[in-house]
Amino acid sequence: MNQTNFGFKKVDYTKKQGLVNNVFSNVADKYDLMNDLMSLGLHRLWKDEFIRQIPNLNSHILDVASGSGDIALKLAKKARDRVNNISLTLSDINEEMLKQAKKKAIDLNLFQNLKFTVASAEELPFLDDSFDYYTIAFGIRNVPDINKALKEACRVLKPMGKFICLEFSKVKEGYMKDFYKFYSFNIIPSIGQMIAGNKEAYEYLVESIDLFPSQDEFRIMIKDAGFEEVGYKNLSGGIVAIHSAYTR
């Protein structure tokens, strides 16, 4: 039996996606609020830096694991302000999360040039060489087969297309590392219980972060998927990192 991690638990590979879906379906309506509380608002700064990695908004952009649409809607607003002709596809395997994204897009009057697709990052329903940019923020670690998702990213990007990934990473400095670990395992699940009524979902969250490969390990995985010019930039001392790469 093929096994993989669901947090610290070992589960059958075929069951992981359903378990992850349940986590996000159960917290979808509190997802944005929890992001603000857990990160003390820092996630907004991280995401602003992330979208700066996309200089050309006259582009076809695929946002995978789009969730409640934070990244895609930031890009859509920036493109509207610049009067750029952007084409954005928001893809997520969880329909409840995409519903949140659609609501936000309507509220912000940003629905134009947006497409919504329920799909797995491992099996994207798009032709080869379809997009100029592939973005994924805080989603890749939830994919059952990360290597397969990276190869799919490489497949759907045009030649010299750019892959950009924002993900929790490894803090290296001693005192900060210790504080971060304490905060993650003791404070975040408690906030999850108080606000979202779901401690287990946020225990999974911090466990999945703890198990995610280091910056350099993930860089090698991206390169092995077929990308070139692979690099990363640490933010907030390595709490998160922006990984980027290009297709041939």
UniProtKB/Swiss-Prot annotation:
Pathway(s): Quinol/quinone metabolism; menaquinone biosynthesis; menaquinol from 1,4-dihydroxy-2-naphthoate: step 2/2; Cofactor biosynthesis; ubiquinone biosynthesis
One GO-annotated biological process of the protein: methylation
Keywords: Menaquinone biosynthesis, Methyltransferase, S-adenosyl-L-methionine, Transferase, Ubiquinone biosynthesis
Annotated EC: 2.1.1.163, 2.1.1.201
Gene3D superfamilies named in the record: Vaccinia Virus protein VP39 (3.40.50.150)
Any Pfam family matching the protein: Ubie_methyltran
Protein residues bound to S-adenosyl-L-methionine: 68, 92
Database matches in InterPro entries: SAM-dependent_MTases_sf, UbiE/COQ5_MeTrFase, UbiE/COQ5_MeTrFase_CS
Catalytic activity: a 2-demethylmenaquinol + S-adenosyl-L-methionine = a menaquinol + S-adenosyl-L-homocysteine + H(+); a 2-methoxy-6-(all-trans-polyprenyl)benzene-1,4-diol + S-adenosyl-L-methionine = a 5-methoxy-2-methyl-3-(all-trans-polyprenyl)benzene-1,4-diol + S-adenosyl-L-homocysteine + H(+)
SUPFAM superfamilies per the UniProt record, alphabetical: S-adenosyl-L-methionine-dependent methyltransferases
Enzyme class (EC, first level): transferase
One Gene Ontology molecular-function label: 2-methoxy-6-polyprenyl-1,4-benzoquinol methyltransferase activity
Functional description taken from the UniProt entry: Methyltransferase required for the conversion of demethylmenaquinol (DMKH2) to menaquinol (MKH2) and the conversion of 2-polyprenyl-6-methoxy-1,4-benzoquinol (DDMQH2) to 2-polyprenyl-3-methyl-6-methoxy-1,4-benzoquinol (DMQH2).
Family: Belongs to the class I-like SAM-binding methyltransferase superfamily. MenG/UbiE family.
Name under which the protein is recorded: Ubiquinone/menaquinone biosynthesis C-methyltransferase UbiE
